[in-house]
């Protein structure tokens, strides 16, 4: 007989503070974080590897290293996000290499970011959290060099918390014959669930930041994430006046704190304040003594959520990340169109939406990625300024407009579909393909794990059909505020018409069932005879109507205390 090392626990699920105002920075452990970099991160293809330093992932790494060559058993109940995210592909690969047997009991309950039926399908959580939960048993035999056999069981759909507890209790052990273990066969990408298609990888990728010469990409490398303010309650509002007033008060408060620190009157900024959001970048600026100037601020209209525009403070010191947006929309006068797609690993099915203004990062699930028709080159801006020392000059004269659609894909499409094909035709072809139900269904798993890729159809007629369809969709999605209203809808009013709205609601068929053919705008106005087909077009988990109902209501931001009344 030999000693058996067993490590069991319920590690913390959180990666750390929600904002710098929490003043609860993540703990850094040099040796442990170094081990994660040398193992899990090394074998992960994703660019953003932050989640690999989550506390529960650190617990896996620490425990694995404690077992050593002698082996043993690890039993954890943790966040289940690692099972299918792109960022954790290297983590899964390492588990497969470092253990002999792996048992995963998925308790589901991952409702964060999910909407409607997708959220209901997850069932209730076994804890009072919105993050999915799984039980993982890792078995390591001494000196075993073979890859692990991976056993997986999903507890099921639509279950209550009590039903899940009963199932767990009835199983009792991973050795129970009642558990119908499924043996998983990972692919080369480290996918355990929802394996991506090999066919998908044969298509041209939308973009590749490493492919500077655009040898085989649809777009040049100037695609971008959406704008990340990290202070939405302070930065966004339907009222331009409120945005400007808030910007000035934030800058004044920041400079007052900066001066106080400089004079030695303040040792540390006030993290509890509602006057400003203390993000990483702002704290770095104040530590350097950098001054903020209201005179340098700019204000833009932004697509904040699908079919919902807001005013925003567009000022780099108070925008945590602008990414490549300044190259896509360098000035208010910029003319451009961008196709925005869901980020990787989102909680709702893939979506896309076209925009002709800046887009917020969270306009689409998991961080919108935006692919432009054009990008603007400012490399000669200083020279242009020398010749434009006159008042009222067009700000866009400082920039040279470049094509966002690559030369490579233009050549490919001309060879396949004829010399008359233009970059605009390709741009709208992309939008048409992305709306194809067959494309979304066939490559559902791929679109959660990778940037979109572009199938090229067989004939010129098929190409133009998708291109023209994409162009028509783009026109509807960009100009939705000016399209002809649906003739069958009726608007009923009572008393003196009053267009103030607190919160729109659906009518009721009975106490539990909404009547989506009727919207109660406010106590005086009701919209009726809405065709149910209007709800079939879904972006980011909701129909366009439901986005309007959700966003066009009076809200008060909890963090800042600022009222937003669209």
Language-model segments: what does each one mean?
Residues 1:
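S-adenosyl-L-methionine
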Residues 5:
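Conserved acidic residues
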Residues 9-13:
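Amphipathic alpha-helical repeat scaffolds
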Residues 14-52:
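Mobile active-site "lid"/loop adjacent to the S-adenosyl-L-methionine
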Residues 21, 28, 46, 62-566:
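Sequence-level detector for compositionally biased, low-complexity segments
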Residues 50-58, 117:
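Conserved phosphate-coordination/catalytic loops
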